């Protein structure tokens, strides 16, 4: 940049700042009377509703003297612009003011995920910019499942959503569903939290500390008397003027009434990255003229233009230009200001509401407690029992849970709960204490030296302990060597010849190490096995310089290999049957662990392994696919650092026998 251009820009910025200061001086309340120049239409509030909602609302709306105007828009959005009767908004005659709650800071300390119900919408509308971080988990209100973000709030309405018109204590009454933005593709409604803050009369400074603009100021600035007027030969919806873009609200005899969006704000709201669905669909029409204020930002005083739109409030910083030479803009944190005004939101929990866990969680005795009644995991179902509690910014639900043979109750963290049911066929996860507290205690007594996973294929349910901890594979690695070799043969368009059949048979049925070494070498050694696991989507394999027997894999990895094999997702039907037949004919002296503790009448496709590990202690494991009548399950039990050979086998026997009895007996 040349020095002349730098001087010109500095002069322009100074002039802009002077104009703002003069406006502040001329308007003591900073905006009860907005500046005459800037902004857009105001009474036409963008409301996205489905066709069904439009039909449901149109008749009573017309009966009440309300004008509805429908605008064609792209994608899944249907926009309805509403002009309230008499030009008044619901908050027009409200005088209430609400001081900030001291409890907001606790929400800022939380790390809430975006609920699966809102993820698709959040991604599509560039939620990282438009909505910001999640400040709460998804929680139930009279509107449905609600999640508050830094800059707004989303709702997934439910069939039980209240249609009551009574103002809720948290401001979330049913009218917001009709004045928000409805996305027909996802069924999500983006709530107009500005409505709530204007109705409450929040006294939080808008734009930054020390700002003279509050939501009380914005409320006053939405009064119809602040509509700007423009002489137009032929009034149109938007008109470019010297001050920006004038958006007409109404027109009569060549005079249009509306608001002007200053160029700096117009540049921001029409940025396709900020508003991928267009400015009206993203922000709604403006409710006010642009208001001037000063605020403390990062310890320095900045001059701002603030403009309220139906769905968001926008501020541009006149003292901070972006790369485009325009003042930097931002969506003001309506969600944060909502929580800062009211504190913990009101939660409405209908008894018996079904939810699912999104990750591993301890179901505890009290909110935030440390005594767990059970450990459940992803996709585990819970039933809400009607109670909830906010604790240090985190929400907890009282829940009931049920497993194969057990049931109980306790408190679950709402941040790990979703209303979205798992995808079809998705399995549920739980700790062993959901199957048997005794087995769970037994496993826990060995700490990190034992890992186990059980997949109850009949009920699509996993139970696990230390499932992601790597253990030395020993001869259980021969299952992966067999599968990867058959895949290699399939890539050549053939099956094993007589010699290869003999090698594979010796490796699996007789656990011949020389046969395993031959297969291992043909596949490229450790790098070949690493490539195999990557190809089938199994993680956690660790190569070892001593060879295939001392390589490591978590119990979950072995479970995934066996599951892919059993479900026919890794080999052709012919090769799958071939592999399982070998595993079903293990020599009698190889039937340890799962093989010697089978339920009566059961069969197993299995592979055990044992080896003195590099530390000189025993690594012993067992794994297999068990079929017992109509029941089928896969079990993996790995041990490490065992000084007693027989004692290590007893661990595998104890777990396999207990699991078999639990899964196959009524």
Model-identified regions with their sequence ranges:
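N-terminal Sec-pathway targeting helices
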Residues: 40-55
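Hydrophobic single-pass membrane-insertion segments
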Residues: 63-76
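N-terminal intrinsically disordered, acidic low-complexity segments at the extreme N-terminus
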Residues: 1-37
């Amino acid at each position: 940049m040349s020095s002349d251009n730098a001087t010109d820009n500095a002069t322009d910025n100074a002039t802009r700042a002077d104009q703002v200061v003069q406006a502040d001086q001329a308007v003591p309340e900073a905006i009860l009377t907005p500046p005459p120049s800037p902004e857009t239409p105001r009474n036409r509030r963008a409301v996205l509703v489905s066709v069904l909602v439009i039909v449901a609302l149109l008749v009573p709306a017309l009966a009440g003297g309300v004008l509805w105007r429908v605008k064609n828009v792209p994608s899944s959005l249907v926009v309805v612009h509403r002009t309230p009767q008499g030009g008044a908004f619901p908050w027009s005659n409200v005088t209430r003011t609400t001081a900030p709650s001291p409890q907001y800071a606790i929400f800022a300390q939380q790390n809430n995920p975006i609920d699966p119900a809102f993820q698709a919408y959040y991604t599509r509308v560039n939620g990282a910019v438009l909505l910001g971080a999640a400040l709460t988990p998804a929680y139930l209100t009279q509107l449905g499942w609600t999640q508050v973000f830094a800059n707004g709030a989303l709702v997934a309405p439910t069939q039980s959503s209240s249609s009551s018109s009574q103002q809720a204590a948290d401001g979330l009454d049913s009218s917001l569903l009709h004045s928000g933005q409805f996305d027909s593709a996802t069924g999500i409604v983006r709530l107009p939290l500005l409505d709530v803050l204007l109705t409450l009369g929040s006294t939080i400074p808008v734009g930054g500390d020390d700002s003279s603009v509050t939501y009380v100021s914005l409320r006053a600035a939405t009064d119809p008397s602040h509509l700007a007027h423009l002489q137009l030969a032929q009034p149109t919806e938007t008109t470019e003027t010297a001050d920006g873009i004038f958006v007409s609200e109404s027109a009569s005899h060549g005079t249009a009434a509306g608001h002007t969006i200053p160029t700096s704000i117009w540049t921001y709201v029409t940025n396709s990255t900020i508003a991928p669905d267009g400015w009206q669909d993203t922000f709604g029409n403006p409710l006010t003229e642009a208001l001037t204020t000063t605020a403390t930002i990062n310890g320095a005083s900045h001059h701002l233009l603030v403009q309220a739109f139906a769905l968001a409030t926008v501020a541009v910083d006149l003292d901070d230009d972006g790369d485009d030479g325009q003042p930097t803009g931002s969506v003001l944190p309506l969600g944060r200001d909502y929580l800062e005004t009211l504190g913990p939101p009101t939660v409405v929990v209908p008894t018996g509401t079904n939810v699912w866990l999104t990750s591993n969680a301890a179901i505890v005795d009290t909110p935030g407690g440390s005594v767990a009644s059970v450990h459940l995991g992803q996709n585990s179902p819970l039933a809400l029992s009607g109670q909830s509690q906010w604790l240090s910014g985190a929400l907890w639900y009282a829940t009931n849970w049920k497993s194969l043979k057990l049931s109980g109750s306790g408190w679950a963290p709402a941040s790990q709960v979703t209303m979205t049911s798992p995808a079809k066929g998705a399995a549920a996860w739980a700790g062993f204490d959901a199957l048997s507290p005794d087995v769970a205690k037994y496993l826990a007594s060995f700490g990190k030296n034992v890992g186990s996973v059980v997949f109850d294929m009949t009920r699509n349910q996993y139970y696990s302990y230390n499932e992601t901890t790597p253990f030395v594979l020993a001869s259980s690695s021969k299952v992966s060597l067999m599968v990867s070799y058959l895949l290699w043969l399939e890539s050549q368009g053939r099956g094993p010849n007589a010699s290869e059949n003999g090698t594979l048979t010796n490796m699996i049925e007789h656990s011949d190490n020389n046969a395993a070494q031959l297969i291992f070498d043909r596949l490229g050694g450790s790098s070949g096995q690493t490539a195999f696991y990557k190809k089938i989507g199994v993680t956690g394999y660790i190569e070892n310089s001593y060879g295939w027997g001392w390589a490591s894999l978590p119990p979950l990895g072995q479970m995934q290999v066996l599951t892919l094999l059993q479900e026919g997702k890794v080999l052709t039907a012919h090769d799958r049957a071939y592999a399982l037949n070998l595993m079903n004919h293990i020599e009698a002296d190889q039937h340890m662990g799962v093989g010697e503790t089978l339920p009566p009448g059961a069969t197993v496709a299995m592979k055990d392994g044992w080896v003195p590990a590099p530390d000189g202690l025993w690594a012993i494991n067992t794994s297999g696919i068990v079929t017992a009548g109509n029941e089928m399950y896969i079990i993996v039990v790995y041990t490490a650092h065992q000084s007693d050979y027989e004692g290590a086998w007893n661990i595998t026997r104890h777990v396999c026998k207990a699991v078999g009895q639990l899964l196959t007996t009524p």
